[in-house]
């Protein structure tokens, strides 16, 4: 079994986006610590299965980030369950999770499942619009969500999600200083190695996503930038 606490760099692949076999091989053989499969829309059992089969040709750990109960399938190493803490809709905080547990609770392997406390900070992002996230937050607001995830809910992961735009480094630094046990994931807007390295100073795990589809070479350079190899 893999130890997620040691993951410094992960790639996130959207099953609803096209990725060539060549580029997928580059991603899986890049030295990244893991590949997360997940997206905000268009996620189906068919495209998740296609992605799973493709990734399983390689040794890299793979994780399904569950956004739709209908797209859950066995075969992944881990399953990340996001709870959008700053959503205005209870379904995205605990509602969908309750439905999943009602349907699959008896057969879940709890050693494979990790809850993520999301704080979505880009109002233009699909995930913000889908979940009706309250994004006009002060730093105190964000730190309060971090404390909620870390100290009250004891979640293993607190995820700062800027999705498509590069975040505030100082905020990431201050959030990290608040966390005692939760692992800090940062995702959003990383388009080059320098940005990845900058965020890696404070985030435990840097998530690289959109740049994979826009500039594969720049995406690959983020691995060494984060891991310092």
Swiss-Prot record:
SUPFAM superfamilies: FMN-linked oxidoreductases. The keyword Transport does not apply. It holds the Pfam family PcrB. Its EC number is 2.5.1.n9. Its cofactor is Mg(2+). GO terms for biological process: glycerophospholipid biosynthetic process. Keywords: Lipid biosynthesis, Lipid metabolism, Magnesium, Metal-binding, Phospholipid biosynthesis, Phospholipid metabolism, Transferase. Mg(2+) binds at residues 14, 40. It is an enzyme of class 2 (transferase). It catalyses: sn-glycerol 1-phosphate + all-trans-heptaprenyl diphosphate = 3-heptaprenyl-sn-glycero-1-phosphate + diphosphate. Sn-glycerol 1-phosphate binds at residues 12, 159-164, 189, 209-210. Pathway: Membrane lipid metabolism; glycerophospholipid metabolism. Homodimer. Belongs to the GGGP/HepGP synthase family. Group I subfamily. Prenyltransferase that catalyzes in vivo the transfer of the heptaprenyl moiety of heptaprenyl pyrophosphate (HepPP; 35 carbon atoms) to the C3 hydroxyl of sn-glycerol-1-phosphate (G1P), producing heptaprenylglyceryl phosphate (HepGP). This reaction is an ether-bond-formation step in the biosynthesis of archaea-type G1P-based membrane lipids found in Bacillales. This is Heptaprenylglyceryl phosphate synthase. The gene is pcrB.
């Amino acid at each position: 079994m893999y130890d997620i606490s040691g993951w410094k760099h992960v790639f996130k692949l959207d099953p609803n986006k096209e990725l060539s076999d060549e580029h997928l091989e580059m991603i899986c053989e890049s030295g990244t610590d893991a590949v997360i499969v997940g997206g905000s829309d268009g996620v189906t059992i068919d495209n998740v299965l296609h992605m799973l089969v493709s990734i399983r040709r390689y040794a890299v750990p793979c994780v399904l980030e569950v956004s739709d109960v209908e797209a859950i399938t066995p075969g992944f190493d881990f399953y990340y369950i996001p709870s959008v803490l700053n959503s205005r809709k209870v379904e995205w905080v605990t509602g969908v999770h309750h439905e999943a547990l009602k349907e699959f609770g008896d057969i879940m392997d709890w050693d494979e499942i990790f809850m993520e406390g999301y704080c979505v900070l880009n109002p233009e992002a699909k995930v913000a619009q889908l979940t009706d996230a309250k994004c006009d937050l002060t730093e105190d607001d964000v730190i309060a969500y971090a404390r909620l995830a870390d100290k009250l809910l004891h979640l293993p992961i607190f995820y700062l999600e800027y999705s498509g735009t590069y975040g505030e480094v100082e905020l990431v630094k201050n959030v990290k200083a608040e966390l005692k046990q939760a692992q800090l994931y940062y995702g959003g807007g990383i388009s080059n190695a320098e940005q990845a390295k900058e965020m890696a100073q404070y985030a435990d795990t840097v998530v690289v996503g959109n740049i994979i589809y826009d500039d594969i070479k720049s995406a690959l350079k983020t691995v060494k930038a984060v891991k310092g190899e």
